[in-house]
Amino acid sequence: MRKNRILALFVLSLGLLSFMVTPVSAASKGNLLSPDRILTVAHRGASGYVPEHTILSYETAQKMKADFIELDLQMTKDGKLIVMHDEKLDRTTNGMGWVKDHTLADIKKLDAGSWFNEAYPEKAKPQYVGLKVPTLEEVLDRFGKHANYYIETKSPDTYPGMEEKLIASLQKHKLLGKHSKPGQVIIQSFSKESLVKVHQLQPNLPTVQLLEAKQMASMTDAALEEIKTYAVGAGPDYKALNQENVRMIRSHGLLLHPYTVNNEADMHRLLDWGVTGVFTNYPDLFHKVKKGY
């Protein structure tokens, strides 16, 4: 397996030289964004074991040696950034309706854990009952510089000013610039406009362009070069990847972090092709798998 990966990386070597001139340099050895690193990104925390996007989910991911914890951001009616995947409250809480129509005080009254016990009775635990929806501030207060953050701006068109609020929080917690280690925070989004805005506000803050399967089906070299003007990497649906398009993305000097990879065989195949990390609900599993590479 290691031999397969070495061969794939050798084929890409000429393209990877261009990585030195990406908007945010990521080639220094030991840097979290080095193409030599294989990153474990805990998708919504250790969400295969614990209710997603809860402090407990992130704590569990840390114990499982995840390199990054992933945060999806939504904004409340009163302008507070909370960590939740969906724009609506219904799936992961006992509330109903759109996040944007509720204040933070309203959302703090909700149970964000019991749904997991009901959906996955084989994984149910009493301590999941009553878990709360965390704010971005609460997550940064809890983990500070002791975690690396992979943060998605969700639905930025719905939440004007989200990017500025996010950057202000990162600055407050000294997670930008000289106060942080290179690559400690990565911003991702399906919205090119949101990432370009982040890049304009903070040129040294790494961004990753998320890609749907249909976008991968029509991906071109020109499109990848455009992504490279504002991002250090691409985050496609792993099911849309094959050896050829992995090689194409990497040849443009972009990091490649597909989502959401939960099967061990898929992990091995993607690593053999040359991805530089994955999003997974099972960070402990991927941490074990990548040791062979």
Curated annotation (Swiss-Prot):
Disruption phenotype: Deletion mutant retains WTA and ceases growth upon phosphate limitation. Mutants show altered cell morphologies and effects on autolytic activity and antibiotic susceptibilities that, unexpectedly, also occur in phosphate-replete conditions. The active site is at H43, H85. GO terms for biological process: cell wall organization; glycerol metabolic process; lipid metabolic process. It catalyses: a sn-glycero-3-phosphodiester + H2O = an alcohol + sn-glycerol 3-phosphate + H(+). Its EC number is 3.1.4.46. One of its GO terms (molecular function) is metal ion binding. Residues 38-290 form the GP-PDE domain. InterPro entries: GP_PDE_dom (IPR030395), PLC-like_Pdiesterase_TIM-brl (IPR017946). It is found in: Secreted. It comes from the Bacteria. Binds 1 Ca(2+) ion per subunit. Induction: Transcriptionally regulated by PhoP. The keyword Heme does not apply. Belongs to the glycerophosphoryl diester phosphodiesterase family. PANTHER family: GLYCEROPHOSPHODIESTER PHOSPHODIESTERASE (PTHR46211:SF7), GLYCEROPHOSPHORYL DIESTER PHOSPHODIESTERASE (PTHR46211). Glycerophosphodiester phosphodiesterase hydrolyzes glycerophosphodiesters into glycerol-3-phosphate (G3P) and the corresponding alcohol. Involved in wall teichoic acid (WTA) metabolism during phosphate starvation. Catalyzes the degradation of WTA, enabling the utilization of WTA as a phosphate reserve under limiting conditions. Is highly selective for the poly(gylcerol phosphate) WTA backbone and catalyzes exolytic cleavage of individual monomer units. In vitro is active toward the WTA oligomer mimics glycerophosphoglycerol (GPG) and bis-glycerophosphoglycerol (bGPG). This is Glycerophosphodiester phosphodiesterase. The lineage of its organism: Bacteria, Bacillati, Bacillota, Bacilli, Bacillales.
